[in-house]
């Protein structure tokens, strides 16, 4: 959005909040509702790379003496966006707080993937209304994926007028300007860009810890699965340059980080938008094998883009872990076609075969949707049989949630909710059964564990994760937090392992 558009939007919002407003005029200037037809045209738009994020003089000490609070919903990408916003707040002079009561600014970084996630946000906005009454100077903001939906922003502006600012996923780097506008405006400041943003490098970050780190390698998704809102809320696929990614990871390694997770809505489409070089995720992973860091993993991958070169590189091992999250969504080819996943059951099983052949100790996890419109009993049984055939270690399972603006939301659905819930229960029973069977096989084995910190259930116990993302609890000195250690597994549960410390710490070669 350019300056002319911004001025136009401010003129549209010039009336008081108590007056009736024609919100459609506002959205004409800054926002476009989800449109499959229009979204698919976007590939022709140029994406620029901005390498220098800097704060103008007017923002020096802007937040001195003030505190911020960010509540994050949803995926790892949102977690990383929160780290960036925390970095910007800190650069402005704000201090973090863990209580909304102490905050001068409260941001809700939202998720739009399912209706339940949106309901949680509106519930929290209701709680914040009372806080705003007690503290009128408090600034409340809504950002993230929900902000990219026109219906959501309309609801906020009509029914949650205590919200001071709304901004989307493409203009996080403009947070200082949005804060300033919200601070001095009597109106709700809304800055939602329908065009996806450019790639902004060197944004400040306040990472949640000093052991593991998220690193974005790309943004957006061009797959347009019929049920998914992400291509609309996150924009088209845009890859960061490999040299920028490698430099960031080398810097993290030099600062003592032990594990990196490469992030992207469709991470293995990385590089497909490059016009000057042929370079994909397999090439990037091959270069990252040479970086002196203990572990590198990635999420989330799409089976359609999981190529043989990537499998070959992952098979080389080293710091590339053996855990692969590979969402299948359904085991029925007919359902997959309606979902527009662009692969079949047979293609997925062949991909799994190739992965297991190249990486014999690979651990696979997945995502599955049950109760997609008109899913038959036979199609659901195909999902159950595929789960058994692949032998997943675990899965994230969901009942289909319609998202406004997606093709699936317009489909007639003859599957009663009671049937959907029963299918989910049956699937979860299978997931739990296989999870404990898989974990039982670790009994007596010695595994490498990266120690995250104290167990959530017992501060006297340490907790960490294996290379295959298994949670391990064991008793050991707290001085080992952040270290790689050897643990012998003594007991297996559905979602975790218990063990005894064998050796500490492990030197990374």
Curated annotation (Swiss-Prot):
Documented EC number(s): 2.8.4.3
Reaction(s) catalysed (UniProt annotation): N(6)-dimethylallyladenosine(37) in tRNA + (sulfur carrier)-SH + AH2 + 2 S-adenosyl-L-methionine = 2-methylsulfanyl-N(6)-dimethylallyladenosine(37) in tRNA + (sulfur carrier)-H + 5'-deoxyadenosine + L-methionine + A + S-adenosyl-L-homocysteine + 2 H(+)
Residue span of region Disordered: 1-26
Cofactor(s) annotated in UniProt: [4Fe-4S] cluster
Binding site for [4Fe-4S] cluster 2: 221, 225, 228
Annotated Polar residues bias: 1-15
A GO MF label: metal ion binding
The protein's enzyme class: transferase
Top-level taxon: Bacteria
Keyword 4Fe-4S: yes
CDD domains (UniProt xref): Radical_SAM (cd01335)
Binding-site list for [4Fe-4S] cluster 1: 75, 111, 145
Compartment annotation: Cytoplasm
Domain TRAM stretches: 440-503
Subunit structure: Monomer.
Functional summary from the UniProt entry: Catalyzes the methylthiolation of N6-(dimethylallyl)adenosine (i(6)A), leading to the formation of 2-methylthio-N6-(dimethylallyl)adenosine (ms(2)i(6)A) at position 37 in tRNAs that read codons beginning with uridine.
NCBIfam families, per database record: miaB-methiolase, MiaB/RimO family radical SAM methylthiotransferase
Protein name: tRNA-2-methylthio-N(6)-dimethylallyladenosine synthase
Upper classification of the organism: Bacteria, Bacillati, Bacillota, Bacilli, Bacillales
